[in-house]
C-alpha cells in the first residue's frame, strides 16, 4: 500500500486529499543466475508467492529460497518460462506458447460441510488490504467445515491464488477448498488441478473454458457464491450446503 495525492469529486466540488493505493511492482524469481519469471504483483507475502507460483505452474521443486527486496532466489530444479515477458496482474497463461492441460484429480476426497454464503462473508472480513485500497483480489483456503486456514491478497487474482497455496505449503496444510474474490477462468482451474484443489468457490462468474476443464478434471466449481442461488458445476457430492446461522444481508 502506498499513499498518493489525488483529487476527490464530492458533489460539485473537487477536494485534494491523500489516498491509499494498492502497490504493484515487478517481482523477479531467479534460480542459478537465470530468471525463472517476472511477475507484476503486490510486494507482500513474497515467499508464499514464489512457492505457490512454482507449485501452481508445475515448474519444478524448491529446496530453499531467499527474498531480497523484490527479488526471490530459489535453490532447486526449476523450469524457466518460455518467454521473459513480465506476467501482469491480469495474466495467467499470457506468455505460454501453448495451453497444456494438466492431469486431473484422481478421485473426490473432499466434502464441504458449511454454508457457502457465510464462508464468502468471512473471506471478505479477512481482506484488510482491500478494505484500505479497494484494489486487490483475495484467495482463502478453507477446511471442510468452512473455516479459513489462510487468506492472501494481491493486485492480481492469479498471484493471490499462488500466495494462498504457498502459505499452505509452508504450514504443512493440504489445500482442497479455495475461495476467490473474482471470476474463474481456465488458468485458475489449471492452477487448482496442479495444486490438488478439488473445490473452487468464487464471487464471480465461471468461463466456458474453466467449465470444460473442471468437468474433464473432476473439479467442483461454485460461481456467484455471494448470491442467493449460486451456480455449481461438476461433482455435486462434494457440496453439503448448510443453512446460514447468521442474518442475511
Please annotate each region the language model reported.
Residues 157-233, 238-244:
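Feature captures the catalytic cores and cofactor-binding loops of soluble hydro-lyases/lyases
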Residues 1-139, 143-144, 150:
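Intrinsically disordered, low-complexity regions enriched in acidic/Ser/Thr/Pro/Gln residues
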Residues 128-171, 177:
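Histidine/lysine/aspartate-rich catalytic loop segments that bind and position anionic ligands
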Residues 91, 242-249:
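Phosphate/diphosphate-binding glycine-rich loops and adjacent basic-rich segments that engage nucleotide
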